[in-house]
């Protein structure tokens, strides 16, 4: 008896699609979940509340120091803000006796508004009406954090309309000022007399409150305000990138535009800004829209469909899944599907497609009796199996309708041309009319300068390309002889936005990370998989443009999750690769019910390429892996930041993500 085989069997489970998967250790599951969470938002397979509960449960299964290290890693390396605070709150609820929590809080809180965010998170997770029972370690950590910020930072994030304000936090944690100047600053917070900060929001708000005789006059005033902000040098990198469309629509002058381009493409400014790569893609997508729905319109469209047609489909989908789970209880899906294919009206036993049925021609009654006996042994009736078959057909129909629905609500900038029938369906005629008026004014201003929108926007697009290229500089360990395959998942679950405010979806992130890798590799094959695998070839120079081109091919390979098709293609072509990288949410299954699986295909491929390594880039963090992580040739990497490539380099040196996190000194 092989005990190793028994241990491997104990790791087996099923993913959300019902396919074979492997459990992760609590540390790995917590890591993959945390670095793929931006807030309490619903994922495709998991609600936001369920994910928070899962994180809270995992915090209690791992050692406290690792949780503190992971919170710091998520904040400093992955550039996440909300989920590190959740980790610290859950850690404070179950760990006491030392200063670990306070030290982690002091280091994790890096923006003034995170002080109040952490307190609101604690109040939410404690289900209390007030903060009177706040953990002493959280108090000490927040008291230290108060001393890290100046008046500008406090004034910028002093929001009086929040449930917990900076004044409330100050009265609660009682920080000790370092000197008289800081004591005066704390008094200003208490009295509400902080100086109004010089920010782009306050300047534009002041300009917008003036009275104008026409829309053109208003645009001129706002344009002048933007130009002053740019020349002042006090416009932040993120604010500049978020408002490129506004600057374009207002047609800022050439001098200001050149300053914006220089700032965006400056490698040092990119490094200090600590922007996630998909932020550059989001700005690039917005600039490439031309007389088409802008991201706000697309978000409104998506909400409409999800709240109406999409919600009805989802409710029916989950109800069918619930019924199928009840029927399948104790019976494997693959066997159930085989029984469903048995035709009642025929006497050919081999058509039954049922294991154990003898080959040959037998009376129908005899065949039915044998199958009925087998089903009874498994705890199912023939009626149950027929019902299961009917439900599966309904489920497949809903999946097709959901795929079509996602086509309408996904952010495909190159395909929103033509009549825009969905505008009338959604009822945003007034919005479209106002946008058209804004675009008409923009075109008029450009015409006066003898420019087209393409000529005006091209330098900004090039600046964004330069910026994102600098984020690829930390990708190490690849030379011209390294053979790499990059595969991106296009399944329906990848069309979920990373957050409610974002126009970027998981599908975009997978493509962008693959294009970043392509930029650094010379011997590379890129492609997408859904129902099948298809390769696409683009020049390696442009990252964002190539991502846009890949987005335009969405739907050509279908919306299934047949990740095994990537490896099967390598087997059929007998292509030897050094590294195979799959960017996915790890919810893979065989939509053809043919018994294929990524793990099985990889084992076969290893006979052709014994030295090949498989890298799974987990973009959603559902807690399972389609291949056993105990294999020495399979690696799991999670997250959306370019810092994931540091983990890739660490793997070459015998380390992994958990080892990197454990090296952090709290």
Question: Residues of each region from the PLM?
Answer:
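Short basic/aromatic active-site micro-motif
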Residues: 507
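Long lumenal/extracellular ectodomains of secretory and single-pass membrane proteins
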Residues: 1-504, 519-666
């Amino acid at each position: 008896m092989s005990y190793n085989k028994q241990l491997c069997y104990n790791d087996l489970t099923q993913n959300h699609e019902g396919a074979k998967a492997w459990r992760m250790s609590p540390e790995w599951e917590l890591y993959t979940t945390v670095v793929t969470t931006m807030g309490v938002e619903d994922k495709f397979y998991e609600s936001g509340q369920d994910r928070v509960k899962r994180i809270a449960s995992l915090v209690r299964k791992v050692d406290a120091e690792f949780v503190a290290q992971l919170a710091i890693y998520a904040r400093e390396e992955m550039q996440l803000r909300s989920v590190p605070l959740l980790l610290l709150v859950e850690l404070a609820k179950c760990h006491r006796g030392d200063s670990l929590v306070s030290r982690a809080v002091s280091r994790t809180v890096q923006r003034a508004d995170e002080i109040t965010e952490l307190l609101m998170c604690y109040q939410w997770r404690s289900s209390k009406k007030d903060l009177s029972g706040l953990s002493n370690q959280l108090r000490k950590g927040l008291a230290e954090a108060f001393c890290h910020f100046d008046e500008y930072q406090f004034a910028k994030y002093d929001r009086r309309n929040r449930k917990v304000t900076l004044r409330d936090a100050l009265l609660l944690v009682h920080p000790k000022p370092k000197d008289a100047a800081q004591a005066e600053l704390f008094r200003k917070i208490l009295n509400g007399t902080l100086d109004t900060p010089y920010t782009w929001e306050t300047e534009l708000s002041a300009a917008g409150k003036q009275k104008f005789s026409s829309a053109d006059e208003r645009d001129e005033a706002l344009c002048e305000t933007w130009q002053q902000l740019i020349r002042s040098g006090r416009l932040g990198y993120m604010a500049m990138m978020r408002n490129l469309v506004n600057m374009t629509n207002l047609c800022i002058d050439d001098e200001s535009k050149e300053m914006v381009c220089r700032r965006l493409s400056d490698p040092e400014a990119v490094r200090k800004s600590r922007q996630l790569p998909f932020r550059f893609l989001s700005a690039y997508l917005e600039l490439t829209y031309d007389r088409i729905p802008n991201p706000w319109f697309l978000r409104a469209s998506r909400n409409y469909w999800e709240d109406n047609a999409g919600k009805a489909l989802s409710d029916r989908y989950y109800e069918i899944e619930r019924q199928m789970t009840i029927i399948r209880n104790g019976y494997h899906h693959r066997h159930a599907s085989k029984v469903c294919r048995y035709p009642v009206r025929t006497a050919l036993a081999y058509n039954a497609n049922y294991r154990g049925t003898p080959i040959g021609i037998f009376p129908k009654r005899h065949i039915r009796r044998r199958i009925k006996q087998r089903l009874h042994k498994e705890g199912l009736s023939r009626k149950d199996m027929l019902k299961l078959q009917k439900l599966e057909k309904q489920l497949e129909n809903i999946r097709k309708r959901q795929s079509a629905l996602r086509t309408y609500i996904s952010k495909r900038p190159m395909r929103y041309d033509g009549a825009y029938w969905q505008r009338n369906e959604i009822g945003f005629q007034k919005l479209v009319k106002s946008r058209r008026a804004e675009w008409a004014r923009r075109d008029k201003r450009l015409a006066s300068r003898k420019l087209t929108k393409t000529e005006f926007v091209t330098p900004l697009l090039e600046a964004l390309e330069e910026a994102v290229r600098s984020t690829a500089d930390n990708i190490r360990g690849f030379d011209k002889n390294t053979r790499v395959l990059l595969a991106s998942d296009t399944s329906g679950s990848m069309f979920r936005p990373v957050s409610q405010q974002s126009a970027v979806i998981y599908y975009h992130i997978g493509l962008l990370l693959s294009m970043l890798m392509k930029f650094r590799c010379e011997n590379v094959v890129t492609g997408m998989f859904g129902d099948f695998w298809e390769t696409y070839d683009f020049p390696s120079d442009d990252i964002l443009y190539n991502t846009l081109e890949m987005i335009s091919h969405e739907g050509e390979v279908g919306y299934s999750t047949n990740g095994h098709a990537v490896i099967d293609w390598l087997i059929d072509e007998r292509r030897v690769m050094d590294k195979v990288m799959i960017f996915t949410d790890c919810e893979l299954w065989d939509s053809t019910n043919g018994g294929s699986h990524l793990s099985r295909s990889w084992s076969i491929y290893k006979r052709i390429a014994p030295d090949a390594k498989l890298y799974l880039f987990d973009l959603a963090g559902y807690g399972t892996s389609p291949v056993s992580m105990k294999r020495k040739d399979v690696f799991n990497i999670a997250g959306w930041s370019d810092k994931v490539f540091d983990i890739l380099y660490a793997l070459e040196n015998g380390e992994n993500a958990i080892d990197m996190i454990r090296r952090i000194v709290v």
